[in-house]
Amino acid sequence: LVGANDDNKGSTVVDLRAIAMDRLEARFDRLEDTHRNVIAAAYDNLAGTNQVHRAILRMMDATTFAQFLTDLSGEVADILRVDAIRLVLESSDPAGLTNTSKTVTLMPEGYVEGYITLGRNMPARQITLREVPTAGGSLYGERASYIKSEACLKVDLGPDRLPAMLVMGSEDPLQFTSHQGTDLLTFFAGVFERVVRRWLG
């Protein structure tokens, strides 16, 4: 009788059960996608945290300031997977601006603020992530044409010292973008400041 009744309904009858199942399956697929994205983001965040921690530990291993600078542009850069690291120090003596280190770059007073803000009348953020402006060429030397994105970390080296900046350059234009979080780099910058202050006494 049930079968006969179903046959008499014809093709114009809407199968509510099938529609409900289709909707449930679509919702389940969306939940699965969300779940996968959340797990992937968690793994990426954990990997980034471990990466920064390893870089900090390597940075703190140096027993001399010269070794610290060598490690910074060498193993620390490798751990962070960046293609260039430069420490920019300001000097109030323009006549003494000679750069002999591939890690440290001396610039005139006011350079850090102007570089981070691109000359705009605004306060410089502690962490700035962006595509490399054309003005960045002088910081990266012979690698300038390859660097496509950068992280600018404004560094406070203590009272009575001019501002400084640590820049990390990458050949990947998407490695540093303005919509990314900056918590890990803020932490790295804080440790970096303390380590450099220790060397500077």
Whereabouts are the PLM-identified features?
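Signal-transmission linkers at sensory-effector interfaces
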Residues: 11-59
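Regulatory loop-to-helix N-cap segments in sensory/regulatory domains
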Residues: 170-187, 196-200
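Acidic/proline- and glycine-rich, intrinsically disordered low-complexity segments
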Residues: 101-133
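Sensory beta-strand/linker motifs that couple input domains to effectors
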Residues: 159-170
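A short, aliphatic-rich beta-strand micro-motif
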Residues: 148-157
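Helix-loop-beta substructure at the N-terminus of cytosolic sensory domains
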Residues: 62-101
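Signal-transducing coupling segments at domain and membrane junctions
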Residues: 125-149
